Amino acid sequence: MDMKKRIHLELRNRTPSDVKELVLDNCRSNEGKIEGLTDEFEELEFLSTINVGLTSVTNLPKLNKLKKLELSDNRISGGLEVLAGKCPNLTHLNLSGNKIKDLSTIEPLKKLESLKSLDLFNCEVTNLNDYRENVFKLLPQLTYLDGYDKEDKEAPDSDAEAYVEGLDDEDDEEDEGEEEDYDEDAAPGEEDEEEGEEDDEEEGEEEEEEDISGEEEEEEELNDGEVDDEEDFEEERGLKRKRELDEEGEEDDD
């Protein structure tokens, strides 16, 4: 897929000014140049063009807010002076896997005053004697070269990754905000359903209590009936016994 089509797909119905992060890795550039990218991407902060066949960055538009630029695994051998004019606020630049052979090629990066991290892995320039020491002298604004500072301390989470995660967090917060708005809209209906369920539960409990009360009353009535029957039976036995005694008394008198 060529770069223009890829950019169109990545827009996903957004306008260029809405885009903060643009990843074009592994697409194809025309004649080794950037194409389809315009200065309408004025809010762009992160651009990745890994392995797209670039030989030059001359067609890069003016991107004042661009902070991180991924250009690794291309065929760039010079022309980096363009970056200072087009991306003046760049803080992270990855040129790993390009055809950069000497320090003079990266010297124009001195004008990128905000440049904090530079990666040149797998470039011939890294084979030069005192490579790291000389690059830090040439570009005093640098904090990290190939992921390590002057004291050979590793950048925390590759510093650049932390920046990209920050962009992702912003997107997540926006998505969460949309979900919360949706939940608020749906809340009244849900509340009605919950109230209805609570009313049904209360009615069910009341009916159960009435059933239990009715059963208890029936048991009491049955018990009362049994007691009455026993009393009647005892009373009848008493009368019968009395009659027998009276009859015995009359016989004795005779």
From Swiss-Prot:
PROSITE patterns the UniProt entry points to: LRR
Gene3D superfamilies: Ribonuclease Inhibitor
UniProt PTM: Phosphorylated on serine residues.
Sequence segments annotated as region (Disordered): 166-254
Gene Ontology CC: cytoplasm; endoplasmic reticulum; nucleus; perinuclear region of cytoplasm
Keywords, comma-separated and alphabetical: Cytoplasm, Endoplasmic reticulum, Leucine-rich repeat, Nucleus, Phosphoprotein, Repeat
GO terms classed as biological process: nucleocytoplasmic transport; regulation of apoptotic process
Superkingdom: Eukaryota
Biased composition, class Acidic residues, residue ranges: 166-235
LRR repeat extents: 16-40, 43-64, 65-87, 89-110
Chief site of localization: nucleus
GO molecular function, a single term: histone binding
Subcellular location as annotated: Nucleus; Cytoplasm; Endoplasmic reticulum
InterPro entries, alphabetized: AN32, Leu-rich_rpt, LRR_dom_sf, U2A'_phosphoprotein32A_C
Ranges of residues in domain LRRCT: 123-161
Record-stated family: Belongs to the ANP32 family.
Purpose: Implicated in a number of cellular processes, including proliferation, differentiation, caspase-dependent and caspase-independent apoptosis, suppression of transformation (tumor suppressor), inhibition of protein phosphatase 2A, regulation of mRNA trafficking and stability, and inhibition of acetyltransferases as part of the INHAT (inhibitor of histone acetyltransferases) complex.
Protein name according to UniProt: Acidic leucine-rich nuclear phosphoprotein 32 family member A
Origin species: Danio rerio
UniProt lineage: Eukaryota, Metazoa, Chordata, Craniata, Vertebrata
